[in-house]
Amino acid sequence: MYATDSRGHSPAFLQPQNGNSRHPSGYVPGKVVPLRPPPPPKSQASAKFTSIRREDRATFAFSPEEQQAQRESQKQKRHKNTFICFAITSFSFFIALAIILGISSKYAPDENCPDQNPRLRNWDPGQDSAKQVVIKEGDMLRLTSDATVHSIVIQDGGLLVFGDNKDGSRNITLRTHYILIQDGGALHIGAEKCRYKSKATITLYGKSDEGESMPTFGKKFIGVEAGGTLELHGARKASWTLLARTLNSSGLPFGSYTFEKDFSRGLNVRVIDQDTAKILESERFDTHEYRNESRRLQEFLRFQDPGRIVAIAVGDSAAKSLLQGTIQMIQERLGSELIQGLGYRQAWALVGVIDGGSTSCNESVRNYENHSSGGKALAQREFYTVDGQKFSVTAYSEWIEGVSLSGFRVEVVDGVKLNLLDDVSSWKPGDQIVVASTDYSMYQAEEFTLLPCSECSHFQVKVKETPQFLHMGEIIDGVDMRAEVGILTRNIVIQGEVEDSCYAENQCQFFDYDTFGGHIMIMKNFTSVHLSYVELKHMGQQQMGRYPVHFHLCGDVDYKGGYRHATFVDGLSIHHSFSRCITVHGTNGLLIKDTIGFDTLGHCFFLEDGIEQRNTLFHNLGLLTKPGTLLPTDRNNSMCTTMRDKVFGNYIPVPATDCMAVSTFWIAHPNNNLINNAAAGSQDAGIWYLFHKEPTGESSGLQLLAKPELTPLGIFYNNRVHSNFKAGLFIDKGVKTTNSSAADPREYLCLDNSARFRPHQDANPEKPRVAALIDRLIAFKNNDNGAWVRGGDIIVQNSAFADNGIGLTFASDGSFPSDEGSSQEVSESLFVGESRNYGFQGGQNKYVGTGGIDQKPRTLPRNRTFPIRGFQIYDGPIHLTRSTFKKYVPTPDRYSSAIGFLMKNSWQITPRNNISLVKFGPHVSLNVFFGKPGPWFEDCEMDGDKNSIFHDIDGSVTGYKDAYVGRMDNYLIRHPSCVNVSKWNAVICSGTYAQVYVQTWSTQNLSMTITRDEYPSNPMVLRGINQKAAFPQYQPVVMLEKGYTIHWNGPAPRTTFLYLVNFNKNDWIRVGLCYPSNTSFQVTFGYLQRQNGSLSKIEEYEPVHSLEELQRKQSERKFYFDSSTGLLFLYLKAKSHRHGHSYCSSQGCERVKIQAATDSKDISNCMAKAYPQYYRKPSVVKRMPAMLTGLCQGCGTRQVVFTSDPHKSYLPVQFQSPDKAETQRGDPSVISVNGTDFTFRSAGVLLLVVDPCSVPFRLTEKTVFPLADVSRIEEYLKTGIPPRSIVLLSTRGEIKQLNISHLLVPLGLAKPAHLYDKGSTIFLGFSGNFKPSWTKLFTSPAGQGLGVLEQFIPLQLDEYGCPRATTVRRRDLELLKQASKAH
């Protein structure tokens, strides 16, 4: 692996094949092999050290026998000595060998570790901010201590490696203005197979207005030029996971409690639930003035349940009327020893436990002498909730300068414990983590510091700070709303050194802090770049090209680019960034994996020029993405209108259409892969796919082989988007690709509405369409849209939308879909209007109101009056099928509907929009709503509003099979048998429907009135699209086989086009257009090819002399002009077949052109003359079907739960716990397991035991314990529950004493719970050595029920001790592998 040049120097690495190549083909970029010195040459043995003592020996004469005996004796001695010598030598050899092996194992270098290269020389440059270091050929340096230098350039085989220790005890900080890695240079901190163990920090320092700026790279950077190597590999950590249990505000289920008041005379008392820390009662007893108050306190304490926590604090004075009986009650029930001697205005505080004795009581007293008396009587005790959270209760009473104060606090102590989905044993005390918002505002994301936690499992951590907001850790209503939790700390840190506040020309009008951080920039033809488990903090600058990680015009960086080891970034933590997270600029084939981008300015994961392809983003988390200044799409409202130096003239940008698009994932080309990512909070969008008409920026002028608009979508699988303001997922629009000019004064790269996504095979519009697949999207708590999707063929499947302003909107185009024949479909999906995630006020959540289902307070999207919709119909054609809707209930403030329509819609909606196999839950009051005049809907008079319609194929929406649903006041689609649904503002009709596309020339501000002959009193007035343009257009939906007349509010158009839209062969309508009586006509027919604008098969219409003749010849090209009424009649009848979802026929769009010649400028409204002459009695063309009865078979999604870990199985469990009145009414108590109901109607306890290792589920035991025999449950819980079991318990009726608290501790509770005199008790537990996060206890006061509770229990976890099943299929990993192969 190493080669020596002619001068005897050894370069650190051999060059790769790509770039400036000097490496042989066997080189693997990034692998580090230390250079071993050659063994010493073998030399001739030096002189043998023979030390033979020459001794004079005496000679003796022996007889032959004696000589023989002596020889035998000597021989035996020699054998014995030889054996002894051999044994000693062998023993010494093995001892020496063991020592050598021990030493070598301890000191031999690991060839995978760059810092163990024996050719490295220790380097300690010291602290010299003026030193400009150049590491060149022959320089192989190991940094061993802190250093400050001006700059470092590594070139021509130079190598810089950070020293490390096996025990990770080194802590090295290198401060420098920049590090430039040039051809042949390399910087290593750890390696993939030998991760860095110590702490390494590179601090990039310098101010924007000081010092020189380097060409290309600028200031404060790590730059990699062609031939350079950058390998940074920190210790592995679980990058991010999800909460497995809800993290409550203040760390307690009902929050913390703080109270303080002056002169609150008497004894102030709080009763606290010992299991939940909830304040149960708050009372004041004026025992100073009134003896009755003393008696009331005595009775109050008498009826408290044993075990309750009681806190008491004196306000002002409490002793004067305090009766002895009350004193004794306090002594007996709370164990007080100081109450007996309580005197005038003495400050006294107590925290005790009812019937807990003196050992449970903590109290304090301070004497009062005069107004100058001071001192605080403070009592405090610590407790645990049943979930194991430690909390304290504090009571205090004091005098301060003559003012009496008393107060209470209930708060967590010693940190808050978090339960997490994955093993986080790699997270250590002192690490920083972030927990994402699970509400509408991304600003509810919170940072925490980890504390030591000896009692925590591998799935738990303890945090120092107290949570301010609620963070969900549950699957709610079948939707995974568990908050993401990311680790920000890494042991390799690259950070920008920043000033205390903004300065110089750093956009200080928008930011009050320094935004001039460091940056990493990688150029084309680098040798090797791999970054893993590195923390980047205060990186990026509000300047173009200066980002935390920036792959700049690198081309192909995988195998296609000649890299045997494809380039990746893995496990990075990029936080508090000043410009983006990772920029992929003119770069293809990059893998971005397990990376966190938190608190950034501008688009976070950013694909820049619209040419970036084949990049894979796998399991990344982005949150708190804020506006920046670089591009118009980064900017917010104020930035957009203030930054006008690049617009033309005096143009003022329009924020909503030019800017305001900042996104966590900005995907500028569809041929990229997104798998398992989370966009958990952006000012505008979570994931935004946009489509460049041509390459932009530094890629401008490059010729793309395929247009992004036409390119099939890469892999989109299992991504989640929430807490975004504009949209979770947005597929639409592009950017302006021309400079500002008088013709278009908008800024270059501002948001543009010209692009239309229409994917085709090989990006060739002449080849078949390729449907873009959005598979497994979870979108919740997005203020506006969960997803807005515009394009050609797009399929959304296996997805869930909850608590969004609008769940999902499909859009195509205003008149005709750009991609002829395309359609959009959503299937196997779930829509939830108002879930049990009620949210939490604060963190810029602006709106709070009352929920429609249970009237509980909840945070709201957009506005308190905003109409919530699950699926929004727009344009078309769309198909909604096999989907379920839950919890859409209006309130007095707002409408809420499962299905709705785009409000204030001026464009077309096709009657080919269709719905089938949908299911509506019991809490859906409005299946459909067409809007009504009022807030948000305004006057509901736009053309699209009036023509809203869809086809209910199977009756699953309306109960009428093969029916169409339109707005109630639309008489173009009605017949006498139609059914009105007033609360929907809808009408349900049978029939066949199509559209007429009417276009006129040179008729600005002209409104069209269309009237059906059967309903002349109910015309429809259409304002037209683009009223001020030269070619306004109108597109009403019409019932086929009917007659219509068309009128105008101004002079009749001289040129009018009528297009038959969505007509099948032989479909027809008759139209009569109003003209002055002296008008002459030229009417022609032709097929228009919309792709190229050509016209074919042109035919002339000929006049006939009567309407009767026209009716007889309706299949011919004829027209009839009735000059008495001014109506030009003709039949619009389709001659050709229409295929699939095409708006037009297979021959082209059938079009009639009317050229009118008249000198009249009168208003052309013929209504008064046309009717009643042409009135027809309303009739039914297609019989109205009978209303369906019974349940819709096979309707709704087959999936019960939608999670971000779809490879796991979850068991849905639902409890129905009625209250006393409901019980007396006969309502059952129910435990439902995976849809199977277990019902009981008699007072007692139902207990189910479920096998946690079986899917879907296996019930192993069902036992009912009647009230009369309820004590048997104690023995059953002791001996009857088998190991490795899920335990589900529910009570019915009031059971005064259920002595099983201590028996629930082994099943998951942290301590015995208070179960006396409860209305209902519900418990989920686990019998085994593992304590899952889902074990829970719910109780309600006497007479009250718990309503409906739903839990989703994971099955087949290794921690349960389940037998190893076959390998779980991981679709995400299969797709990742597929994406890598596609590279």
UniProtKB/Swiss-Prot annotation:
Gene: CEMIP2
Glycosylation sites: N248, N292, N914, N1234
Organism: Homo sapiens (Human)
SMART domains: G8
PROSITE patterns named among the record's database cross-references: G8, GG_LECTIN
Organism lineage string: Eukaryota, Metazoa, Chordata, Craniata, Vertebrata
One GO biological process term: hyaluronan catabolic process
Domain G8: start-end pairs: 121-245
Cytoplasmic side stretches: 1-82
Extracellular side: 104-1383
Top-level taxon of the source organism: Eukaryota
Protein name: Cell surface hyaluronidase CEMIP2
Annotated GO CC locations: cytosol; extracellular exosome; intracellular membrane-bounded organelle; membrane; nucleolus; plasma membrane
InterPro entries for this protein: CEMIP/CEMIP2, CEMIP_beta-hel_dom, CEMIP_X, G8_domain, ILEI/PANDER_dom, Pectin_lyase_fold/virulence, TMEM2_PANDER-like
Induction pattern: Up-regulated in by proinflammatory cytokines in normal human dermal fibroblasts (NHDF).
Occurrences of domain GG-type lectin (ranges): 255-412, 1208-1366
Placement of PbH1 repeats on the sequence: 669-691, 711-733, 791-812
